[in-house]
Amino acid sequence: MNEAFDCVVIGAGPGGYVAAITAAQAGLKTALIEKREAGGTCLNRGCIPSKALLAGAEVVTQIRHADQFGIHVEGFSINYPAMVQRKDSVVRSIRDGLNGLIRSNKITVFSGRGSLISSTEVKILGENPSVIKAHSIILATGSEPRAFPGIPFSAESPRILCSTGVLNLKEIPQKMAIIGGGVIGCEFASLFHTLGSEVSVIEASSQILALNNPDISKTMFDKFTRQGLRFVLEASVSNIEDIGDRVRLTINGNVEEYDYVLVSIGRRLNTENIGLDKAGVICDERGVIPTDATMRTNVPNIYAIGDITGKWQLAHVASHQGIIAARNIAGHKEEIDYSAVPSVIFTFPEVASVGLSPTAAQQQKIPVKVTKFPFRAIGKAVAMGEADGFAAIISHETTQQILGAYVIGPHASSLISEITLAVRNELTLPCIYETIHAHPTLAEVWAESALLAVDTPLHMPPAKK
């Protein structure tokens, strides 16, 4: 007789494992199915390993600028294989901790590929094939890097890389091309440029980071260009050829050669061959599974979370969706709220944003005021030697409600949390500038930006009248 569970989760990425833990904590008998390692793309092939390498690149930057602090460093070198070894160690350590969490929550783990055979049964394909029954099912199958048309990622073309393969390089490329100027492309461009690579970013549109607001796109393009990154915009790549020790690219009819090429042109959803048709779950031509605000699909006992929902392709969104889905399965009535989703670009400098952008506000005909306060007027940033950049608040012109924000500069990834809380709770400008911010800290930039919105900044000359 097939074992039965209250909740079966297919996929143990940042959405799936969080959903499974939440379900188990609610007292549900829970199973988690994963064909690879717990943690999914984020932990094993994405967020965490890339940030481990970026941490090393940040140390390189600090050494290069050490003279500014009265510290002279002679003859340092980069041992890239050791950086990769550290990256792998970081991933292993976190994964071991995650596996311990899963065990401690008494979640039954099945190793293999999960596929629906009905709305209440899941087949597990692997070394020990089996079928389990489920009262409720959460689909959390994620996505994979999209290949360049006609050029699949394979061992036969080791110099043509996806975001997974580039993390396993054993050397720093002398000359590298990155096809795609989105978030992932720009993060790797920033990483390898900092480590000494000559990097060219090839982008089909007229701007990089095109899904963000134009101010971010232009500011980061200018910063990257000053740093020495090369961009080819409005570019058409008609051919990629691995010629052994090099890769040959044809860009706008011109032939260029590189040591490695990273293809970063988006991700494809893992909704094929998971039995959606057998369970009656609807998906569109892109593979997106529509859900309601409780993460329920068109089949009442089947939920979907993460990339396959077609919302934000962000680990923290998948995790929150997983919590919402599991709590609804456990009998709570909760709905997802996408009004305050923080987004971070881990480049040098960092970029973060949340809520409405000025462009979105204009499109929705919402009257807003955008105030940008520079880090050069923040004492802590100057003391750190990282005074480049700014923090901007988007507030309603009449009500002073904080509708969004974006920040380019030191520790932007951490700074955005304060304004995420403000947007989520519909706070107003006084809630920020009337709150005492510790001094000297980078977070003071938000108080100053909020004061600037009411024309009373403390550390900026008054506007000329």
UniProtKB/Swiss-Prot annotation:
Q: Which family does it belong to?
A: Belongs to the class-I pyridine nucleotide-disulfide oxidoreductase family.
Query: Could you share any additional remarks the record makes about this protein?
Result: The active site is a redox-active disulfide bond.
Keyword vocabulary terms for this entry = Cytoplasm, Disulfide bond, FAD, Flavoprotein, NAD, Oxidoreductase, Redox-active center
Question: Any transmembrane segments, and where?
Answer: none
Q: Name one GO cellular component term.
A: cytoplasm
Cysteines engaged in disulfide bonds, as pairs: C42-C47
Q: Which protein is depicted? A: Dihydrolipoyl dehydrogenase
- Quote the cofactor binding remark: Binds 1 FAD per subunit.
UniProt GO BP: 2-oxoglutarate metabolic process; pyruvate metabolic process
What is annotated as the active site? H439 (proton acceptor)
User: According to its UniProt record, where is this protein located?
Assistant: Cytoplasm
What the protein does? The branched-chain alpha-keto dehydrogenase complex catalyzes the overall conversion of alpha-keto acids to acyl-CoA and CO(2). It contains multiple copies of 3 enzymatic components: branched-chain alpha-keto acid decarboxylase (E1), lipoamide acyltransferase (E2) and lipoamide dehydrogenase (E3).
Q: Quote the InterPro entries the UniProt record gives.
A: Class-I_Pyr_Nuc-Dis_Oxidored (IPR050151), FAD/NAD-bd_sf (IPR036188), FAD/NAD-binding_dom (IPR023753), FAD/NAD-linked_Rdtase_dimer_sf (IPR016156), Lipoamide_DH (IPR006258), Pyr_nuc-diS_OxRdtase (IPR001100), Pyr_nucl-diS_OxRdtase_dimer (IPR004099), Pyr_OxRdtase_I_AS (IPR012999)
> Which reaction is catalysed here?
N(6)-[(R)-dihydrolipoyl]-L-lysyl-[protein] + NAD(+) = N(6)-[(R)-lipoyl]-L-lysyl-[protein] + NADH + H(+)
One GO MF annotation is: dihydrolipoyl dehydrogenase (NADH) activity
What is a single Pfam family found in this protein's UniProt entry?
Pyr_redox_2
EC id: 1.8.1.4
Keyword Hydrolase carried by entry = no
User: Where NAD(+) is bound, by residue?
Assistant: G180, G181, G182, V183, I184, E203, V237, S264, I265, G266, R267
Ligand binding (FAD): E34, K35, R36, E37, A38, G39, G40, T41, C42, K51, G114, D307, A315
Q: Which gene encodes it?
A: lpdA
Q: Which cofactor does it need?
A: FAD
Report whether Disulfide bond shows up as a keyword of the record. yes
